[in-house]
Regions:
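Short, basic/hydrophobic alpha-helical segments
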Residues: 65-84
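Acidic/histidine-rich, metal-coordinating catalytic segments
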Residues: 81-93, 116
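Active-site proximal helix-loop segment of RNase H-like, two-metal nucleases, encompassing DDE(D)
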Residues: 123-145, 156-158
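Extended, low-complexity cationic-aromatic segments
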Residues: 1-69, 171-179, 183
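Short, aromatic/basic amphipathic alpha-helical patches
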Residues: 95-105
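C-terminal domain-tail junction helix/linker
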Residues: 148-184
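RNase H-like polynucleotidyl transferase catalytic core
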Residues: 26-35, 104-122, 138-140
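Mobile genetic element proteins and their domesticated derivatives, centered on retroelements
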Residues: 3-5, 46, 52, 71, ...
Length: 184
């Protein structure tokens, strides 16, 4: 099972640092410069749930060709067995070229997530890790620097990947300081 999604647009700018505190007890802040420009990048990603490894690519826009390239990379990275790709309901996921590609690759089965249930797609949670690893506290001049940061961050996250599970982990059992025993 693979979760696929798009992130973006990511514009070249200064991103806020990760939450943290300085040695003297103040929040770490950075001067932020925000501007809207034509130079931006979209990040396409696929998360393999069983081992936590991800596959990313960047593109200049969010369209059918970018998603088609992501599907090709997913099929090449997982050469055997059926692939169930969990995806959102974007129109580019159901376009004509995608349907033709899916007909040529019968082992790839798209599974659309229900409307309003993006939390079911674990790729959304993985984007949070990528943003923190690639963008936090960084300044980018153009889309090529964003592409480089995404590739490096994906490699670092894949190096320490673990299987993903839906739901929250069980809380650790509390240890009581006193044990009360009642007698009748």
């Amino acid at each position: 099972m693979i979760c696929a999604d798009e992130l973006g647009p990511v514009s070249p700018r200064t991103f806020a640092p990760p939450p943290g505190w300085s040695a003297d007890g103040h929040r770490i802040k950075a001067p932020l410069a925000y501007s809207r420009g034509l130079d931006k990048a979209w990040v396409y990603g696929a998360l393999r749930v069983r081992d936590g490894c991800a596959l990313t690519r960047t593109g200049p826009s969010r369209n059918t060709l970018g998603y088609l390239d992501l599907l090709d990379r997913i099929a090449q990275a997982n050469p055997c067995g059926d692939l169930y790709v969990i995806q959102d309901n974007l129109s580019s996921h159901t376009s004509g070229p995608i349907q033709v590609w899916l007909a040529e690759h019968p082992r790839v089965h798209p599974v659309p997530s229900p409307v309003g249930a993006s939390w079911l797609d674990l790729q959304e949670a993985w984007w949070r890790l990528l943003r923190k690893e690639a963008f936090a506290g960084q300044t980018f001049a153009d889309h090529t620097e964003i592409e480089h940061a995404v590739a490096r961050a994906t490699d670092r996250l894949n190096a320490r990947a673990k299987p993903w599970v839906w739901g929250r982990p069980q809380p650790t059992p509390r240890r009581y300081r006193r044990v009360f025993a009642y007698r009748l």
